[in-house]
Amino acid sequence: MLDFEAIIEAGEQLIQKISFDLQHISSVLNTQVFDPFEYCYYRGGSFWEIESAEEFSGDDEFT
């Protein structure tokens, strides 16, 4: 005979695990991936940080 109590308990555990996994996936998707080339430019063998794209004069080479 089926043990409905055990089946329900296993189902609840599975739902909790899926919920945790979905929350983790959601938090990972909400984080911003850092792109150093969005904030830096290359000049004379070094990377330099810029506050905005307007600060870049265009004379230097982006890499």
From Swiss-Prot:
State the superkingdom.
Viruses
Question: Pfam families given for it?
Answer: IBV_3B
- Which InterPro entries would you find in this protein's record? IBV_3B
UniProt name for this protein: Non-structural protein 3b
